[in-house]
Amino acid sequence: MLDSKLLRGQLQEVADRLASRGFSLDVARIESLEERRKAVQTRTEQLQAERNARSKSIGQAKAKGEDIAPLMADVERMANELAAGKAELDAIQAELDGILLTIPNLPDASVPVGASEDDNVEVRRWGTPKAFDFEIKDHVALGEISGGLDFEAAAKLSGARFAVLRGPVARLHRALAQFMINLHTGEHGYEEHYTPYMVQAPALQGTGQLPKFEEDLFKITREGEADFYLIPTAEVSLTNLVAGEILDAKQLPLKLVAHTPCFRSEAGASGRDTRGMIRQHQFDKVEMVQVVEPSKSMEALEGLTANAERVLQLLELPYRVLALCTGDMGFGAVKTYDLEVWVPSQDKYREISSCSNCGDFQARRMQARWRNPETGKPELVHTLNGSGLAVGRTLVAVLENYQQADGSILVPEVLKPYMGGVEVIR
């Protein structure tokens, strides 16, 4: 969440910067609440001073043998007014805090200004899409040939947007996740974590999914107990490991990685990507999270993005990197790069990773801090997250880019050690 001081001192500037994201800040409402807050605070401070003076005069009057009943009545009246004033202050602050929780992060000055994904800026490309000399099949057709993808069985179990994987295709899916985890822990310096797949509301508020995006989440209601939510990404559980903590400078940067299933309702995706594994209610993802000193977060974003790119390079999958524009960035991001992998059957690049610097936005919500050795005081950390990668979409890319004319699939060289001798999926 944004620093409340920004809304008090730079409200119009904040509103202008948020407008570049397509977000309309209710300036009049915030100004009205702030004026009320100041007025009530001034009144309660004056009342407290008067009450203190009256309380002091009670002792003096008592020493002189004077009647203190009127003074006592005044003090009691002021105490009641003070309690009412503090309650009003708390209510105003709660309303301001509620507004803050719905305001997205401010984009960095380096982020391209734009309204939608059409305004994203391509930064670079890697690899060249293969020219096939036969009719390209999509991953659904390839899965039917091998028997490795079964969407009908999944629909019988769970409905639309699920998949059952079998045999070598299931093993290939597992191999991809193992390869990614081994790469990030072995070469990129991340520490592997196994975290809960269900979290409570404060964790989702900490990373920004709540309260604004509850409709995108799967919720488990429990009578008499706190509700659970299925994680939409391991970003939630990994990042919240530092919630409420004050980290030593020597602990930074923290680099965490986890392989988990992710669960999303896809509430706004009706009619999009209904065929295949591109958009599912349940999918696996390897997630990278970094917690860093504020001055190093932009450098860390470049490194995080390079870590995700390395997966695609070793798999020899063509991809491109986009700098997202202000209107297409996620709620909590200061700056985001998307990686898009080439999908032959669609003749275009599709998103496979999103790498974001969230600045102190999540840290403020979580109260995640580090002790700055220069000041000796606790300060907010910066947090970053990125997919390294979405396993299901990577499987789609491998199946389609490594397909042969007969519908068989060559296993990428880097995955062969994980495939138990299987080099071709038929």
From Swiss-Prot:
Pathway: Aminoacyl-tRNA biosynthesis; selenocysteinyl-tRNA(Sec) biosynthesis; L-seryl-tRNA(Sec) from L-serine and tRNA(Sec): step 1/1
Origin: domain of life: Bacteria
One GO term (biological process): seryl-tRNA aminoacylation
Catalyzed reactions per annotation: tRNA(Ser) + L-serine + ATP = L-seryl-tRNA(Ser) + AMP + diphosphate + H(+); tRNA(Sec) + L-serine + ATP = L-seryl-tRNA(Sec) + AMP + diphosphate + H(+)
Subunit structure comment from the entry: Homodimer. The tRNA molecule binds across the dimer.
Role this protein plays: Catalyzes the attachment of serine to tRNA(Ser). Is also able to aminoacylate tRNA(Sec) with serine, to form the misacylated tRNA L-seryl-tRNA(Sec), which will be further converted into selenocysteinyl-tRNA(Sec).
Name of the featured protein: Serine--tRNA ligase
Biological classification of the source: Bacteria, Pseudomonadati, Pseudomonadota, Gammaproteobacteria, Pseudomonadales
